Swiss-Prot record:
This is Trigger factor. Residues 163-248 form the PPIase FKBP-type domain. Keywords: Cell cycle, Cell division, Chaperone, Cytoplasm, Isomerase, Rotamase. The lineage of its organism: Bacteria, Bacillati, Bacillota, Bacilli, Bacillales. Its EC number is 5.2.1.8. It catalyses: [protein]-peptidylproline (omega=180) = [protein]-peptidylproline (omega=0).
Length: 433
């Protein structure tokens, strides 16, 4: 078999492949064995028609398409390897010659990976992130943890305040007419949660138990129910009950409840500070890496084929569908609720998809330029890390993945990202007051 590659404009080229006649004849034999099983010819049992009779009655041409289907996949794969091209989409194939006793010749218009012209990726100026944990940040984390232990207590006297949870009855109307979904009794609403129409929760502040009030709000212009969008509505609202969060005081007992390794408040604070400091350092490093990746990508010039963007969009839509499925929705239901269709969703995602492709091509090109590879030791370390993280054995991970190619590529790219950050020039950011 022979193959030639002729580069055309942009990211396309013409692959011309010639398969020798002896392989064509073998493919025709295979095609005949398949087709003859489906043929009925008077005087012969089904599947027992001799080849000469078949060709006399139907012509050898009746076998050509099946022979092409047999020859093409392997021939195309071998041609790709022989010419060392990297297709990014299915080719457009045109058969030039298929005939018994002659070579099989076909041409394939192929879109390949684009040329990547790297810009500066070393010595990038990136902002140094703050890693020191402040006392305020520690206290905020303590308050957050204590908040999970808070109990809801009925407010016997007093008025609704931000952060309270109120139990209300309400009935909404537009132009004096009630609308679907605008009525409820015994509804619990946390003030300040932002879960109601803008302006509704704020108007409940200052109300007392058993007090009634007309709450007037305007639906957002982009409201999902088109018949209500932009319209003013009045909600007759009654407060049935007011509850507030009673947060426990941090004691040695509570400290141990929050952290089994801490027996005192001081030990709890020390352990928490250590964990938070480690997390802040990790987060800071990740932010620095992201900035380095973005700048290296921005400095790179690539003419990205539309096919690569579409492939990435397919992946992103699939990821999105999986995420909303975890919330009990499917894509069609989401489209009905949001008023979008898949075309609009893909258009909304297109810029991100293009950036993802460009970033991946940039990092891969840097790996090649710097001759960065993932060693067996690197892969073993990553497998051990995953084993601890997900609490499953290394063998189970290998069996699930089938091979370690994905891990190998991930480790390789992570090495590139480390190189970008390690070779960056850090500048101090402007601290906010």
């Amino acid at each position: 078999m022979t193959a030639t590659w002729e580069k055309k404009e942009g990211n396309e080229g013409l692959l011309t492949v010639t398969v020798p006649a002896e392989k064509v004849n073998k493919a025709l034999d295979q095609a005949f064995k398949k087709v003859v099983k489906q043929i009925n010819v008077p005087g012969f049992r089904k599947g027992k028609v001799p080849r000469p009779i078949f060709e006399q009655r139907f012509g050898v041409e009746a076998l050509y398409q099946d022979a092409i289907d047999i020859l093409l996949p392997d021939a195309y794969g071998e041609a790709i390897d022989e010419t060392d091209i990297k297709p990014v989409a299915q080719p457009e194939v045109s058969v030039t010659q298929i005939e018994k006793g002659k070579d099989f010749i076909f041409e394939a218009t192929v879109t390949v990976e684009p040329e990547v012209k790297l810009g500066d990726y070393k010595g990038l100026e990136i902002e140094k992130q703050e890693t020191e944990l402040s006392d305020d940040e520690l206290q905020e984390a303590i308050d957050h943890s204590l908040g999970h232990l808070a109990e809801m207590v009925v407010k016997e006297d007093g008025v609704v305040e931000n952060g309270d949870t109120v139990n209300i009855d309400f009935s909404g109307s537009v132009d004096g007419e009630e609308f679907e979904g605008g009525q409820a009794e015994g509804y619990d609403l946390e003030i300040g949660s932002g879960s109601f129409i803008p302006g509704f929760e704020e108007q409940l502040e200052g109300m007392k138990v058993d007090e009634e009030k007309d709450v007037v709000v305007t639906f957002p212009e982009e409201y999902h129910a088109e018949e209500l969008a932009g319209k003013e509505a009045t909600f007759k609202t009654k407060v049935n009950e007011i509850k507030f969060k009673e947060v426990p005081e941090l004691t040695d007992e509570i400290a141990n409840e929050l952290d089994a390794e801490a027996n005192t408040v001081d030990e709890y604070k020390e352990n928490l500070r250590k964990r938070l400091a480690e997390q802040k350092a990790t987060d800071a490093e990740n932010v620095e890496k992201e900035e380095a990746i973005t700048k290296a990508t921005d400095n790179t010039t690539i003419d990205i084929p539309e096919a690569m963007i579409n492939t990435e969009l397919d992946r992103m839509v699939s990821e999105f569908a999986q995420r909303i499925q975890q919330q009990g929705l499917d894509l069609q239901t989401y489209f009905q609720i949001s008023g979008q269709d898949e075309t609009q969703l893909r258009e909304q995602m297109k810029d991100d998809a293009e950036q993802r492709v460009k970033t991946n091509l940039t990092l891969t090109a840097i790996a090649e330029a710097e001759k960065i590879e993932a060693t067996d030791e690197d892969i073993d370390k990553e497998l051990e890390k995953m084993s601890k993280q997900f609490n499953i054995s290394v063998e189970d991970i290998k069996n699930t993945l089938g091979n370690t190619d994905i891990i190998k590529n991930d480790v390789r790219i992570q090495k590139v990202i480390d190189l970008l950050r390690d070779n960056a020039k850090f500048v101090e950011g402007t601290k906010e007051d």
